[in-house]
Amino acid sequence: SLVELGKMILQETGKNAIPSYGFYGCNCGWGGRGKPKDATDRCCFVHKCCYKKLTDCDPKTDIYSYSWKNKTIICDVNNPCLKEMCECDKAVAICLRENLDTYNKKYRIYPKFLCKKPDTC
């Protein structure tokens, strides 16, 4: 669910997910679509594509559990769809951390109507 995703992002980046990424660029947060503005926005684009592959669970509401051991996210989930969802969230959290140096405050609250035609997954 969005709760686990937010926790992972905080653990990996040290940033609070909603204010930092909830409205970032064209692909982060609700209703995001369009050509990614930068590497951080591309992380969110790839994450949305990952979610599109999920067929038996709802990323917004279904809950899974994970472990945080030695600063590493471990998706220890038995349900195949929830495990895949956890892996999607883990991947975006790591991607956001790896691209912290390109995080651009001008994209933090980006007007979605400025976003051009979306890339395809």
Swiss-Prot record:
GO terms for molecular function: calcium ion binding; calcium-dependent phospholipase A2 activity; phospholipid binding; toxin activity. Pfam families: Phospholip_A2_1 (PF00068). Belongs to the phospholipase A2 family. Group II subfamily. K49 sub-subfamily. This is Basic phospholipase A2 CoaTx-II. GO terms for cellular component: extracellular region. The keyword Chaperone does not apply. Expressed by the venom gland. Its main location: secreted. Snake venom phospholipase A2 (PLA2) that lacks enzymatic inactivity. It shows antibacterial activity against both Gram-negative and Gram-positive bacteria, including methicillin-resistant strains. In vivo, it causes local muscular damage, but no systemic damage (intravenous administration does not elevate plasma creatine kinase). Also causes an inflammatory activity that is demonstrated by mice paw edema induction and pro-inflammatory cytokine IL-6 elevation. A model of myotoxic mechanism has been proposed: an apo Lys49-PLA2 is activated by the entrance of a hydrophobic molecule (e.g. Keywords: Antibiotic, Antimicrobial, Disulfide bond, Myotoxin, Secreted, Toxin. GO terms for biological process: arachidonate secretion; defense response to bacterium; lipid catabolic process; negative regulation of T cell proliferation; phospholipid metabolic process. PROSITE patterns: PA2_ASP (PS00119), PA2_HIS (PS00118). Disulfide bonds join C26-C115, C28-C44, C43-C95, C49-C121, C50-C88, C57-C81, C75-C86. The lineage of its organism: Eukaryota, Metazoa, Chordata, Craniata, Vertebrata. Homodimer; non-covalently-linked. The record marks K112, K117 as: Cationic membrane-docking site (MDoS). The record marks L114 as: Hydrophobic membrane-disruption site (MDiS). InterPro entries: PLipase_A2, PLipase_A2_Asp_AS, PLipase_A2_dom, PLipase_A2_dom_sf, PLipase_A2_His_AS.
